[in-house]
Amino acid sequence: KYSYRNPKNYIKFTPELFQQVAPVEIYRAEEKLLYRFIGKVPVFTYDNNKTLSLNSCNIVIPQIEGMHIKYILAVLNSSVAAFYINKKFHSVKLLRSHIESFPIPVISSEKQENIIKKVDCIINSNKNIYNLYTELDTDIMSLYKLSKNQIETIYNALSDKNLFLAAR
């Protein structure tokens, strides 16, 4: 989650030879989120390197006024999002409509900045980041004003899923 490893293999980008290709400007966007199309929980990563991806990894470029892309990244990678998407859609496929239906709390720029600092630490860290994941997940949970019982329900429902994929 949050970041991706540097690739070891490459495909020559010749879109005219490919079966299915998004417009080049989407791949080459200054900032975008890449997400795993198939999986038990949502897995989003931030890209500001104009990275190309295969079709098993979809692209979303959030344009929500007043919301920073890394704040949206944190919310979409949260246990709340995983729980919501699992319970509402009962699918291993993560569709754009699923993402668009997920409510993202409106918070101040200052609060977003605190979350973004943690996201940046996760993206840039090579060390064990489990504690950062947990801390960030707790921060996101608090935005939804969930009770202890609701939080416990979410964690119990996701207990068999790997929520903390290694970043590097």
Outline where the language-model segments fall:
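Non-catalytic DNA-recognition/assembly elements of restriction-modification systems
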Residues: 106-168
